[in-house]
Amino acid sequence: MNYRYRAVEPFWKHFHRLNDAQKESARQTWKIFRENPFDPRLRTHKIHKLSSLYGETIYAVDIEGDLRSTFYVDGNWIVSVDIGTHDIYKG
């Protein structure tokens, strides 16, 4: 499917707080993500706690180490919600 992409404010706020190496890892992951958000290399997985909290199926992709990015699918849109450590799963 051809998705369109956007990010909401928590994502950008937290992205700008990452160090340069983390930002570069996120950019490299983004290249794969743009091709296929469910590519096995990303280890995309549902975050059930956030999904029930927000009423949307929330997914996370692994970027590096403990760094994750969360998103949901809205029709043909992929909406990036947040980026950070496992703490972002707390909602």
How would you describe each model-predicted region?
Residues 32-61:
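A short, surface-exposed loop/turn module that caps and links secondary-structure elements
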Residues 20-23, 35-38, 68:
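Generic structural signal for secondary-structure transition and capping sites
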Residues 2-4, 10-20, 54-56, 60-91:
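Enriched for short, Lys/Arg-rich terminal
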Residues 4-5, 40:
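Residues that recognize and position ribonucleotide moieties
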